[in-house]
Amino acid sequence: MSDPAQEVEAPVEAAPVASSPKGKKEKAPKAPKAEKPKSDKPKKPKAAPTHPPVSEMVVNAITTLKERGGSSLIAIKKFVAAQYKVDVEKLVPFIKKFLKASVAKGTLLQAKGKGASGSFKLPPAAKKVDKPKKAPAAPKPKSTNKRVTGEKKVVKKPAAKKPEAKKATKAAKPAAKKVAAKPAAKKAAAPKPKPAAKPKKEVKPKEEAKPKKAAAKPAKPAAKPAKKPAAKKAK
């Protein structure tokens, strides 16, 4: 008989679990996130500012206050709040930024202090630019008046040409006189028919005396009829 201790079977070794490379655990693939639908609500338009730019407000405050030692930040804030009716505390960072940048550029002068805590004023050149100078523009129309007078002189020069027209009229008048003289010549030729008055001369007392001679000499009356043709020549 066999020994029962020998008949006991050896325990079966468990197969080793396959390990992932580099000892890392495999992550399950994530499901893609569903995109959120975009809202169709229209964006609200930005409200238009009810005040001018900060730079304009600060410069206006400094020019209006006209402080010899310059305007401080507190004075500028009070002026802006009273003039433009805005929340100055919200604008303080922008005011300080503008003051520092303007001092660096030279558009503002810092009379006292450092940074934005001092007092500020405009440079002399900027004050001259701000003053409007419209007075020199007034004399300009005078030069235009001179040009107009010069044009008038040019207009007067053509008036000197009028004597030429007079000469033309004078030259036309002698021609008219010549035309008028021609009828006078015709009138001078008209008196030619006056010789018709000659027959009056023929009626002379001498002719009346001739019959007396005929009475004395009866033989001569035969010759008188021959003298009648002489009267035709007078016509």
Swiss-Prot record:
Biased composition (Basic residues): 225-235
Record-linked SMART domains: H15
A Pfam family assignment: Linker_histone
Disordered as annotated region, ranges: 1-56, 112-235
GO terms for MF: double-stranded DNA binding; nucleosomal DNA binding; structural constituent of chromatin
PROSITE patterns per UniProt: H15
Main localization, broad class: nucleus
Subcellular location: Nucleus; Chromosome
Listed GO biological process terms: chromosome condensation; negative regulation of DNA recombination; nucleosome assembly
SUPFAM superfamilies xrefs: Winged helix' DNA-binding domain
Biased composition (Low complexity): 1-21, 181-191
UniProt record similarity statement: Belongs to the histone H1/H5 family.
Protein name in the entry: Histone H1E
Organism placement in taxonomy: Eukaryota, Metazoa, Ecdysozoa, Arthropoda, Hexapoda
